[in-house]
Amino acid sequence: KKLWEADEASTNASLMNLAIYSEDPDSLLRNSDAIQELTREHACRAILIGMDRGASETRIQAWITAHCHLAHGKKSVCCEQVSFLLQGKVIGRLRNTIFAHLASDLPLVFWWQGELSDLFEAALYRMIDCFVFDSTEWDDPRAGFAKIEEAVEARERIVVQDLAWTRSHHFRMAVAGLFDDLVAQRALGEVDSLRVVAHSGQRTTALLMVAWLATQAGWRPGLELDIAAERAAGCDECFMLESREGRSITVKGEWDDAGAALGLVELHAPDCLVRVSREGDASYLQQRLECPGHELMLRGPADEISSADLVADQLSRSGRNGLFRK
């Protein structure tokens, strides 16, 4: 408080509490850099927590930092950051540390990095208004999503934001944009294959993209899933879906570690091709529609690459993310 009173050129600004938690004790410096970028557009009170659960000695270390940015070339707007390194036994210390340093009248956005450990419990998530995570970081996504579902049931108004879902935002918009075309709409019921290419570390991102397409198109798991999947060749991961019309749809997942997180979404019908692609870290997506006597080629924005930029995008869009929760 005295810091802000002594500096007439700076204003302390906060629109939310933003906590970043990691069980990597070396994460504090990296996450401080992320806060520096996030506060350019999102004023907040930042709480960084690094946890070293394997330490033999139980102790807490804390640091206070201010991230300042010039507002219209005049007064600088500053956001306060409190960083904690918790070592050793952590029973009750995580939530108590957060509780004690929240701006009580502001919502809490909590970004959990890495696996959901036993510290993700009701006493913690009942404090949270928006929970940000990245399911591509989990070894067991099924178990992780079960914990998320439990949290949503216990606290209905919590907003959950998976960066694996955010990472495909512009891909989804690009595919939807191509299907605004009447020719593509007529071909949707005849789609017989879907090909998705992604980085091997982004399997969940790819599967969420497939799930979105299936939900929007009304596809369901095929009745002969296992047998049909064995017949589908030339892919790293294959399975079958069935359209509303009863048509079998082969889904082919391929991993390209030299490419983008999500590099290609391609739908085939007998006479039509709908394709959205991204080359490496290009800042744009290429959209293509090919049907007899009708061709369309467009470009659109691509999704951000870094996790911090994805979080910034998600904070800008806000909303309850109802489609993801389906």
What are these regions (language model features)?
Residues 1-14, 63-65, 165-184, 326:
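Short N-terminal or domain-adjacent regulatory/targeting segments
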Residues 62-73, 129-138, 150-156, 231-233, ...:
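Acidic, Ser/Thr-rich peripheral helices and adjacent loops at domain boundaries
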Residues 82-84, 88-185:
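Conserved, well-structured core segments that form the ligand-binding/active-site neighborhood
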Residues 164-230:
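ATP/pyrophosphate-binding catalytic subdomain of soluble kinases
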